[in-house]
């Protein structure tokens, strides 16, 4: 290109690559006798990203962990739920093996292994999905089924889920197509009765219908980054058949549906098996016997259930399991708060009786593992507020009375004679 820059002031500068003037672009970057505009920089970045995409699949082919390795990794972060972890490990392994080898093997078409997690609040459904995504280093996004509506109604369109997934990987379509989507509260979109209604159920059966193609596999058209700012740009085409969908819900009352089916099978009249109250199965035992017909009676449509072939049930966490969750996983709650206090140069000790009290409180609230953090946060709030302004504190001790609200944490100072409770 000829030199379009002139020495006199007020003369235009031009991009050395596309020839646009400084008034036609937002930014013109100067180098030794050359200039490049922001549009050409963006184009260069796109070219580099495309090159990286072509190399990435070859790296990924050797990175798929075995079901045993997936299960072991889940054990590091999730307490209990052994059967659910095994089911998830196999389903996830099969899904990514299918992606690596194409949708067919020796002429046999391989179906998607989308997953349905059934279990009470705070049992670890979301944590399992998040942990899997971290292990596999794939994009992960969550959606709340209760906010979804059919296209054309007020609410969140189901295809917004794919947009969120794209945002997590900087709109890299290839990465998004290897991602995991977790849809929570899926039980809340059950239809209101067993019989289809002539009236529209835009937040129930209608959403199930809208999710069908997305979960099974379709090419979703998603606005590019910037969306409405650049209407002339073509929509991104995302193949959802390669995305793993995990749906989760508490399904309150499903155990009763299963119990009715199981008990009906025991017979009536003189030949009936009479069961004592003590023989009744627990909620967890009943959920483990779930069949597609139970989910249909609960309010999920048959087509939707068919798109979620892998079903894993999670048990309500016991008090012992909650205590384990507090101290054993790699990112256990007590370890997180101890790390926070260490940043202040202070040790934090949770006595065993304190852990028992935290677990008991969570059990009473029926919040499962999800409620543990709020209990610990409330117990430590005043201490975390005062500690940065205090001097010579070496250790903070939490016992049962602190969790119960009867006393303040014990503060241990550097000088033995200065030991005192912060509440004194």
Curated annotation (Swiss-Prot):
Reported function: ATP-dependent specificity component of the Clp protease. It directs the protease to specific substrates. Can perform chaperone functions in the absence of ClpP.
Any one GO cellular component localisation term in the record: HslUV protease complex
Source organism, top-level taxon: Bacteria
Protein keywords: ATP-binding, Chaperone, Metal-binding, Nucleotide-binding, Zinc
Pfam families xrefs: AAA_2, ClpB_D2-small, zf-C4_ClpX
Protein name per UniProt: ATP-dependent Clp protease ATP-binding subunit ClpX
Residues in ClpX-type ZB domain copies: 2-56
Record note on quaternary structure: Component of the ClpX-ClpP complex. Forms a hexameric ring that, in the presence of ATP, binds to fourteen ClpP subunits assembled into a disk-like structure with a central cavity, resembling the structure of eukaryotic proteasomes.
GO molecular function: ATP binding; ATP hydrolysis activity; ATP-dependent protein folding chaperone; protein dimerization activity; unfolded protein binding; zinc ion binding
Family indicated by similarity: Belongs to the ClpX chaperone family.
Binding positions for ATP per the UniProt entry: 120-127
Keyword Zinc recorded: yes
Positions with a binding annotation for Zn(2+): 15, 18, 37, 40
GO BP field: cell division; proteolysis involved in protein catabolic process
Transmembrane stretches, start-end: none
